[in-house]
A protein has these predicted regions:
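Cleavable N-terminal signal peptides of Sec/SRP-targeted secreted and luminal proteins
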Residues: 10-31
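N-terminal mature-domain region immediately after signal-peptide cleavage
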Residues: 3-6, 28-358, 362-370
Length: 370
């Protein structure tokens, strides 16, 4: 019978999240998904990322079967954005063998950005309007995020060939780079026709690469917004209603005869209810398959809820709860850009860990305090 592993507190920053990696007793748990659609079918899309020898590839509509079996295809995706029945869009992304892992992960991000570009714009519009009095993050916060991204790239360049975790971090950044490129193609296509989308009639993409990086880091921004005084929370001592607002998430683990069940409730703001259930099959790139409760533009969960199946019998469920820490001085002393964001450390652990204890050890390295 599987049992919970050790968990690790985040020692720095405003919040302490408890990320609980659990060994799964049921082999098929990474196929976990929300209840099936109860309404009529919605029109979905299938796309493929085709590698081009001369450089950047492109997404193209998949009009028939084939997927990874087609020449030059490094990743495929299917997406159904219908949320009326139960609130969830569905995204499935598969990497294809025959290319190096970075090209596959770039392709995985590309097809996701291409099919969910409009949803990414809508999610950021909701987020920025709700979180920033000026409607956009302050310049100092953007500079901090840019510095953190630059530091992460520098570490990958310096250590990827000798350290597996930095090699995996390189794949995470390739995933993000692909998301940006796919979104840009999506925006270009939507901007060329007045289809009612947010890109219609616009000369260029609504979201620049750094904004997409911030969109993908909204969990970490919960601390950083307050640190830079650009969020509605501001700085200093938090009133009781603010404390209550940031006490996030509940997790349930139940042991039954011959099985272990896990459930999670995320306490998200109403503006964050653009939700997407994602299935990532990165078997050919990373030896992992993940089922993730997520949102548009996020390459992780943020809730957090993951079910992970990996080579060698790896079976993990990862859930997050939050104990908030409201200490502005502590935040300013310990949070710096020479670190890895929470979602990056969680992704590293999901991709590399062979068990719960190793998961927590990977997660604590280069802790950003966010």
């Amino acid at each position: 019978m599987a049992r919970p592993a050790l968990y690790e507190h985040r020692r720095a920053g405003r919040r302490r999240r408890l990320l609980l990696p659990l060994l799964l007793a049921a082999a098929g748990a990474a196929g976990a998904a929300p209840p099936p659609l109860r309404g009529g079918p919605c029109q979905g899309r299938r796309v493929a990322y085709r590698h081009r020898a001369e450089g950047l590839g492109a997404a193209e509509e998949e009009l028939g079967a084939g997927g990874c079996g087609r020449p030059g295809v490094a990743a495929v995706a299917s997406f159904n954005g219908c949320t009326a029945a139960d609130g969830w869009g569905r995204l499935s992304v598969t990497t294809c063998a025959g290319f190096d892992a970075r090209e596959q992960m770039f392709g995985a991000g590309y097809v996701e950005g291409f099919v969910t570009g409009l949803q990414m714009e809508l999610y950021w519009a909701n987020y920025a309007a709700a979180e920033y009095p000026a409607g956009a993050p302050p310049a100092a916060l953007r500079s901090w995020m840019a510095a953190q991204l630059d530091w992460a790239r520098e570490q990958v360049d310096a250590h990827a060939e000798s350290e597996p975790r930095w090699a995996a971090m390189g794949l995470i950044l390739a995933h993000y780079d692909g998301l940006v490129a796919g979104y840009n193609q999506s925006s270009l296509q939507r901007g060329g026709a007045d289809d009612g989308g947010s890109a219609a009639g616009r000369a260029g993409p609504l979201l620049d690469p750094l904004t997409i990086y911030m969109l993908g880091s909204v969990g970490d921004l919960e601390e950083l917004n307050g640190m830079f005084g650009g969020g509605l929370r501001g700085a200093g001592s938090a009133p009781r209603e603010e404390v209550d607002r940031l006490m996030d998430c509940s997790a349930l683990v139940k042991v039954t005869e011959g099985d272990l069940q896990a459930a999670h409730a995320t306490w998200r703001s109403y503006y964050a209810m653009l939700r997407t259930w994602k299935r990532y099959d990165f078997t050919s790139a990373l030896g992992r398959r993940l089922s993730v409760a997520s949102s548009p533009g996020l390459l992780h969960s943020k809730d957090d809820f993951y079910a992970v199946v990996g080579d060698g019998g790896v079976r993990l469920v990862v859930m997050e709860t939050t104990n908030s820490v409201f200490n502005q001085t502590h935040l300013e002393e310990h949070v710096h850009p020479e670190s890895l964001l929470s979602w990056q450390r969680a992704s590293l652990a999901n991709y590399l860990a062979q068990g719960p204890f190793e998961w927590t050890q990977l997660f604590t390295r280069h802790n950003s305090g966010t």
